[in-house]
Design a protein with these regions (language model features):
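Substrate-binding/access-modulating region of protease and related hydrolase catalytic domains
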Residues: 1-105, 117, 191-210, 221
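Extracellular S/T/G-rich loop segment that most often corresponds to the catalytic His/Ser-adjacent loop
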Residues: 91-216
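Phosphate-handling active-site elements
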Residues: 218-224
């Protein structure tokens, strides 16, 4: 929901939009972004929200920018992990936020991801529309279980709740090859015996709600 004609007429002050970017149309407002049809209706809805919600102070739309830094269209693309500049430390992104139609709209606070080292997460899509970064982490693989020492896969990810039970959610889906001992799909970790938590969540879809939560606290302290 963009906050226009919501069920029951109930609107929110803050909308977290945790989905990334698409490539159907680089410019204008046609095409599709994820499962959301983009057109004048979307632009009008966002504009209405920022002009009318919160008693005229405006709704706040917090949007994840995507995880496409390393997403190449072919194996020969000189970007991300495939970039010949990796060794010199000048890695080029495979895309930027402005190539997504929805990220060309001015009505959102767009959020990139950073990790525990307080630098950009390896996957986070860069671009001129990024306002701020939130915590997205890396991939949470254990170097004791996998040969990932010193790579992006070893960096800690985000700890969060999961679907209950060891056959459900992220833990259940990866039970055959859990990233670390906490994600043991047999319930073998004493602090996660019911598999209700996962320690390998990541992405700008994690970063955006972390920022949305901070924004909520700011509005609680200063609603005007």
């Amino acid at each position: 929901s963009w906050g226009v004609n919501p069920p029951g007429g109930v609107t929110a002050d803050i909308y977290n939009l945790s989905y990334g970017q698409g490539y159907t149309t680089a410019f204008g407002l046609s095409g599709t972004i994820g499962d959301e049809a983009q057109g004048s209706t979307t632009q009008d809805a966002l504009r209405y929200g920022v002009q009318n919600h919160r008693n005229g102070l405006g709704a706040l739309y917090i949007k994840s920018t995507g995880n496409a830094f390393n997403t190449a269209t072919s194996s020969t693309t000189a970007c991300g992990d495939e970039s010949p500049w990796v060794a010199s430390g000048s890695v080029l992104s495979c895309t930027e936020t402005w190539l997504s139609t929805v990220h060309s709209l001015p009505y959102m606070i767009q959020v990139a991801a950073l990790g525990a080292a307080e630098v950009k997460s390896s996957y986070s899509t860069p671009g001129p529309s990024v306002w701020i970064s939130g915590f997205g982490g890396e991939y949470g693989y254990s170097s004791a279980l996998f040969n990932v020492a010193g790579t992006k896969f070893e960096g800690p990810a985000i700890m969060t709740t999961d679907q209950s039970g060891c056959t459900n959610g992220y833990v259940g889906a990866n039970a055959a090859q859990e990233q670390n001992i906490f994600n043991d799909g047999t319930g073998g970790h004493p602090e996660n015996s019911d598999c209700n938590y996962v320690s390998s969540f990541n992405g700008t879809s994690s970063a955006a709600p972390s920022v949305a939560g901070v924004v909520a606290l700011m509005l609680e302290a200063n609603p005007n």
